[in-house]
Amino acid sequence: MSIEIKNTGVKKVVLAYSGGLDTSAIIPWLKENYDNCEIIAFCADVGQGEEELVGLTEKALASGASECHIVDLKEEFVKEYIYPTIASGAIYEGTYLLGTSMARPIIAKAQVEVARKVGADALCHGCTGKGNDQVRFEGCFAALAPDLKVIAPWREWTMQSREDLLAYLAERDIKTSASATKIYSRDANAFHISHEGGELEDPWNEPSKGVWTLTAAPEDAPNKPEYVSLEVEHGRITKVNGEALTPYAALMTLNAIAAPHGVGRIDITENRLVGMKSRGCYETPGGTVMFAALRAIEELVLDKTSRNWREQVAAQMAHLVYDGRWFTPLCKSLLAASESLAESVNGEVVVKLYKGQATAVKKRSPNSLYSEAFATFGEDQVYDQKHAEGFIRLYSLASRIRALNANDVKSK
C-alpha cells in the first residue's frame, strides 16, 4: 500500500510520536520509503495524562524506532505558553481558548532540540493534510530549524483510512491496540481536551454524552455552587484557595475543582487556517476559571485606553497562536505589550462555579482604579457634579459644530 518515494539522503529522523495508529504506521513507512533511515521517537508530555505514556517506549521500539525520548514539558507549557497567552486575553473567534494551538510551538521546539541532540537531519509529524497542525508544526520548524528536512507522510503515502493503516501494520506483524471503530479524534493536554469527528461532523447533531470526557454535564452538576479564590500577580495565578502553587499545579487544581461543575464546555464551528470550517467540542475547566479571574482584575486596574489596547493585542494574539506563528517578531512584540499591561494586574478574585458557569463575584486589587467614593449613587463629598458640564460641552463639540454647519447650509 506504500508508494515508492525517492530517497533524499535522510539518515536519521525524529518523529513526533504519540503511540496512536498514525504514528505507529509512520515508523515502518519511513524505514521502507527513506532507505531504512534511523527513527528516533519523540513524545512531549504536556499533561495529556500518565495513561497515554505507559508503555510508549516499548511500543515505539517494537514498531521499529531505535530510541524513544519522552520529554516532560508540563511546567514549562503552563508557565511559558499558557500563562502569557491567557494574560494577553487571546480567545479565538470569541470562544476558543486555544488549548491545542498553544501546545504546538512548545512541542515543535522540543522536537527540534531532540533532533539537535541526536544529530538528526529530518523531522517528521503525523498531521493530516486537511488540518491546522501541519501548518503550525512546519511553521515552527521553519523558524527554529530551517536546515532540517520535514517529512509529512499524510501528504505522501497512499493510505487514506484507519482500515488502510491497520492493514498496513498487520501485514508487517506490528501490534496495535487501535481498531477501525474509533469514533472521535481527541487531543488532550493540561489545559484542555478537544473532540472532533464522528457525530460531530453533522452540525445538526447535538453532542451526545459520550463526547465529553473531562467535565460533568451542567444539568448533572451539583445544585449548590462552589466558590474558589484565586490570587493574581502580574497577570499570573499564584495561589488557589490561599495555597501557593506552581503554574502547572494551579491549573491541575482548578481543573479538578471546576470539572465537576461542568465548567469550560464549548461546541463551536471554527474557521481553520487551511480554509475550511470544522466543528469541535472543547473542555477547558481550569483555564476557563483562570480566564475569568484575570478579566475581572483587569476591569479594576486598566483604564479605558489601556483596556482598548489590550483588546487589540488579544485579537492579534489569538490569530497568531491559532495560526502557529509563536516564533515570530510580531508575537514577541505582542507578548511584551501584554506583559507591560499585566504589571498592574494584581489582586484577588472569587469565582463562583455553578451549572457550567464560572462567574467572578468578588474582586479586589491594590492597583484598583475603582473608587466607591467617586462611583456611589448616594451623597458624596468628593465629586462636584457641576464639573461634568464643561466636559460634556467639549466632548460633544464636534457634534455641535457639525449640526451648526448643517443648519447654516439649510438656511442658505
From Swiss-Prot:
Pathways per UniProt: Amino-acid biosynthesis; L-arginine biosynthesis; L-arginine from L-ornithine and carbamoyl phosphate: step 2/3
Binding site for L-citrulline: Y96, S101, N132, R136, S185, S194, E270, Y282
Record-linked PROSITE patterns: ARGININOSUCCIN_SYN_1 (PS00564), ARGININOSUCCIN_SYN_2 (PS00565)
CDD domains: ASS
Locations listed in the record: Cytoplasm
Family per record: Belongs to the argininosuccinate synthase family. Type 1 subfamily.
HAMAP family noted in UniProt: Arg_succ_synth_type1 (MF_00005)
Designated name of the protein: Argininosuccinate synthase
Organism name: Shewanella baltica (strain OS195)
